Amino acid sequence: MSKIEHNSAKTIDGGAAALHKTVVMVGMMGAGKTAVGRALAQRLGVPFLDSDAEIESAANMSIPEIFERDGEAFFRDRESRVIARLLEGAPCVLSTGGGAFLAEANRRMISEHGVSVWLKADLTVLWNRVRHKDTRPLLRTADPRATLRALYEARVPLYSEADLCVISDGETSIEQMVDRVIAALATRKDVLELS
Protein backbone atom coordinates (compact mmCIF):
# COMPACT_ATOMS: atom_id res chain seq x y z
CA MET A 1 0.00 0.00 0.00
CA SER A 2 1.05 3.56 -0.53
CA LYS A 3 2.82 4.81 2.56
CA ILE A 4 0.83 8.03 2.34
CA GLU A 5 -2.81 8.18 3.33
CA HIS A 6 -3.95 10.58 0.67
CA ASN A 7 -6.16 13.31 2.01
CA SER A 8 -4.91 16.29 0.04
CA ALA A 9 -6.44 17.37 -3.24
CA LYS A 10 -4.84 17.64 -6.66
CA THR A 11 -6.88 18.34 -9.75
CA ILE A 12 -6.24 17.57 -13.39
CA ASP A 13 -6.61 21.31 -14.10
CA GLY A 14 -7.74 20.83 -17.66
CA GLY A 15 -4.72 18.72 -18.58
CA ALA A 16 -4.92 15.33 -20.23
CA ALA A 17 -4.81 12.14 -18.20
CA ALA A 18 -3.80 8.72 -19.51
CA LEU A 19 -5.03 5.76 -17.47
CA HIS A 20 -2.89 2.67 -18.04
CA LYS A 21 -4.50 0.24 -15.56
CA THR A 22 -7.97 -0.35 -14.23
CA VAL A 23 -8.61 1.46 -10.95
CA VAL A 24 -10.37 -0.89 -8.54
CA MET A 25 -12.21 0.83 -5.70
CA VAL A 26 -12.19 -1.25 -2.50
CA GLY A 27 -13.41 -0.69 1.03
CA MET A 28 -16.33 -1.12 3.38
CA MET A 29 -19.95 -0.69 2.45
CA GLY A 30 -20.73 2.99 2.71
CA ALA A 31 -17.16 4.15 2.01
CA GLY A 32 -18.26 5.78 -1.27
CA LYS A 33 -16.79 3.34 -3.79
CA THR A 34 -19.63 3.65 -6.28
CA ALA A 35 -20.23 7.41 -5.98
CA VAL A 36 -16.53 8.31 -6.04
CA GLY A 37 -15.76 5.68 -8.67
CA ARG A 38 -18.46 6.96 -11.02
CA ALA A 39 -17.26 10.57 -10.66
CA LEU A 40 -13.62 9.50 -11.08
CA ALA A 41 -14.41 7.64 -14.30
CA GLN A 42 -16.23 10.68 -15.64
CA ARG A 43 -13.31 12.95 -14.76
CA LEU A 44 -10.79 10.59 -16.41
CA GLY A 45 -13.02 9.94 -19.43
CA VAL A 46 -13.08 6.17 -18.97
CA PRO A 47 -15.91 3.69 -18.41
CA PHE A 48 -17.28 3.05 -14.93
CA LEU A 49 -18.19 -0.50 -13.99
CA ASP A 50 -19.73 -1.82 -10.78
CA SER A 51 -19.20 -5.50 -10.00
CA ASP A 52 -22.38 -5.70 -7.89
CA ALA A 53 -24.47 -4.18 -10.70
CA GLU A 54 -22.94 -6.63 -13.18
CA ILE A 55 -23.79 -9.57 -10.89
CA GLU A 56 -27.35 -8.33 -10.42
CA SER A 57 -27.78 -7.91 -14.17
CA ALA A 58 -26.46 -11.39 -14.96
CA ALA A 59 -28.58 -13.03 -12.23
CA ASN A 60 -31.64 -10.86 -12.88
CA MET A 61 -32.04 -10.41 -9.13
CA SER A 62 -30.71 -8.16 -6.38
CA ILE A 63 -27.71 -8.94 -4.19
CA PRO A 64 -29.97 -9.50 -1.13
CA GLU A 65 -32.06 -11.95 -3.21
CA ILE A 66 -28.91 -13.81 -4.31
CA PHE A 67 -27.71 -14.03 -0.69
CA GLU A 68 -31.12 -15.31 0.44
CA ARG A 69 -31.59 -17.84 -2.36
CA ASP A 70 -28.05 -19.09 -2.96
CA GLY A 71 -25.98 -17.98 0.04
CA GLU A 72 -22.88 -15.87 0.47
CA ALA A 73 -20.43 -18.53 -0.81
CA PHE A 74 -22.29 -18.74 -4.13
CA PHE A 75 -22.34 -14.94 -4.38
CA ARG A 76 -18.59 -14.65 -3.66
CA ASP A 77 -17.81 -17.20 -6.39
CA ARG A 78 -19.85 -15.24 -8.93
CA GLU A 79 -18.29 -12.01 -7.73
CA SER A 80 -14.77 -13.37 -8.39
CA ARG A 81 -15.76 -14.48 -11.88
CA VAL A 82 -17.28 -11.11 -12.71
CA ILE A 83 -14.25 -9.20 -11.43
CA ALA A 84 -11.92 -11.42 -13.50
CA ARG A 85 -14.00 -10.71 -16.61
CA LEU A 86 -14.14 -6.97 -15.98
CA LEU A 87 -10.38 -6.75 -15.39
CA GLU A 88 -9.74 -8.21 -18.86
CA GLY A 89 -11.09 -5.13 -20.62
CA ALA A 90 -9.57 -1.74 -21.34
CA PRO A 91 -8.60 0.43 -18.36
CA CYS A 92 -11.63 1.70 -16.49
CA VAL A 93 -12.79 2.45 -12.96
CA LEU A 94 -14.26 -0.62 -11.24
CA SER A 95 -16.22 -0.43 -8.01
CA THR A 96 -16.34 -3.69 -6.04
CA GLY A 97 -18.51 -4.91 -3.22
CA GLY A 98 -17.18 -4.56 0.32
CA GLY A 99 -16.29 -8.25 0.57
CA ALA A 100 -14.61 -8.64 -2.81
CA PHE A 101 -11.11 -7.69 -1.64
CA LEU A 102 -11.21 -10.22 1.21
CA ALA A 103 -10.47 -13.19 -1.04
CA GLU A 104 -6.74 -13.64 -1.56
CA ALA A 105 -7.33 -14.74 -5.15
CA ASN A 106 -9.22 -11.50 -5.85
CA ARG A 107 -6.48 -9.37 -4.28
CA ARG A 108 -3.86 -11.12 -6.42
CA MET A 109 -5.96 -10.77 -9.58
CA ILE A 110 -6.58 -7.07 -8.91
CA SER A 111 -2.88 -6.49 -8.23
CA GLU A 112 -1.87 -8.21 -11.47
CA HIS A 113 -4.36 -6.40 -13.72
CA GLY A 114 -5.13 -3.12 -11.98
CA VAL A 115 -4.46 -0.91 -9.01
CA SER A 116 -6.52 -1.09 -5.81
CA VAL A 117 -7.63 2.10 -4.08
CA TRP A 118 -8.95 1.69 -0.54
CA LEU A 119 -11.46 4.35 0.44
CA LYS A 120 -10.74 4.36 4.16
CA ALA A 121 -13.61 5.60 6.31
CA ASP A 122 -14.01 5.23 10.05
CA LEU A 123 -16.83 3.26 11.62
CA THR A 124 -18.92 6.32 12.51
CA VAL A 125 -18.87 7.61 8.92
CA LEU A 126 -19.80 4.17 7.60
CA TRP A 127 -22.62 3.68 10.10
CA ASN A 128 -24.09 7.11 9.30
CA ARG A 129 -24.13 6.20 5.61
CA VAL A 130 -25.60 2.68 5.82
CA ARG A 131 -27.86 2.63 8.87
CA HIS A 132 -31.03 3.66 7.03
CA LYS A 133 -30.55 1.34 4.05
CA ASP A 134 -32.08 -2.11 3.84
CA THR A 135 -30.03 -3.21 0.81
CA ARG A 136 -27.11 -4.58 2.86
CA PRO A 137 -27.72 -8.30 3.44
CA LEU A 138 -24.83 -8.66 5.88
CA LEU A 139 -26.43 -6.05 8.16
CA ARG A 140 -29.77 -7.84 8.43
CA THR A 141 -29.06 -8.84 12.02
CA ALA A 142 -30.46 -8.08 15.48
CA ASP A 143 -27.66 -5.54 16.07
CA PRO A 144 -26.53 -4.16 12.70
CA ARG A 145 -24.10 -1.64 14.23
CA ALA A 146 -22.29 -4.42 16.13
CA THR A 147 -22.26 -6.47 12.93
CA LEU A 148 -20.78 -3.54 11.01
CA ARG A 149 -18.13 -3.12 13.72
CA ALA A 150 -17.20 -6.82 13.54
CA LEU A 151 -16.99 -6.68 9.73
CA TYR A 152 -14.89 -3.51 9.94
CA GLU A 153 -12.44 -4.99 12.43
CA ALA A 154 -12.07 -8.17 10.37
CA ARG A 155 -11.70 -6.42 7.02
CA VAL A 156 -9.44 -3.44 7.73
CA PRO A 157 -6.25 -5.58 7.87
CA LEU A 158 -7.06 -6.92 4.39
CA TYR A 159 -8.03 -3.53 2.97
CA SER A 160 -4.68 -2.22 4.22
CA GLU A 161 -3.06 -4.45 1.56
CA ALA A 162 -4.50 -2.19 -1.15
CA ASP A 163 -2.02 -0.41 -3.40
CA LEU A 164 -3.25 3.06 -2.41
CA CYS A 165 -5.28 4.47 0.48
CA VAL A 166 -7.50 7.55 0.31
CA ILE A 167 -9.23 8.91 3.40
CA SER A 168 -13.03 9.20 3.18
CA ASP A 169 -13.89 11.40 6.16
CA GLY A 170 -17.59 11.96 5.61
CA GLU A 171 -17.19 15.73 5.25
CA THR A 172 -15.47 15.81 1.87
CA SER A 173 -17.53 16.21 -1.30
CA ILE A 174 -17.48 13.57 -4.01
CA GLU A 175 -15.53 15.93 -6.28
CA GLN A 176 -12.95 16.53 -3.55
CA MET A 177 -12.70 12.77 -3.03
CA VAL A 178 -12.03 12.40 -6.76
CA ASP A 179 -9.25 14.98 -6.41
CA ARG A 180 -7.75 12.89 -3.59
CA VAL A 181 -7.94 9.68 -5.62
CA ILE A 182 -6.32 11.36 -8.63
CA ALA A 183 -3.53 12.67 -6.39
CA ALA A 184 -2.95 9.13 -5.11
CA LEU A 185 -3.04 7.62 -8.61
CA ALA A 186 -0.63 10.27 -9.89
CA THR A 187 2.02 8.85 -7.54
CA ARG A 188 1.97 5.75 -9.73
CA LYS A 189 3.20 6.62 -13.24
CA ASP A 190 2.46 3.03 -14.32
CA VAL A 191 -1.21 3.74 -13.59
CA LEU A 192 -1.94 7.40 -14.38
CA GLU A 193 -0.04 10.01 -16.36
CA LEU A 194 -1.09 13.62 -16.07
CA SER A 195 0.02 16.23 -18.59
Curated annotation (Swiss-Prot):
It catalyses: shikimate + ATP = 3-phosphoshikimate + ADP + H(+). Its EC number is 2.7.1.71. Binds 1 Mg(2+) ion per subunit. It is found in: Cytoplasm. InterPro entries: P-loop_NTPase, Shikimate/glucono_kinase, Shikimate_kinase/TSH1, Shikimate_kinase_CS. One of its GO terms (molecular function) is magnesium ion binding. The keyword Transferase applies. ATP binds at residues 30-35, 136. Pfam families: SKI. Belongs to the shikimate kinase family. Catalyzes the specific phosphorylation of the 3-hydroxyl group of shikimic acid using ATP as a cosubstrate. This is Shikimate kinase. The gene is aroK.
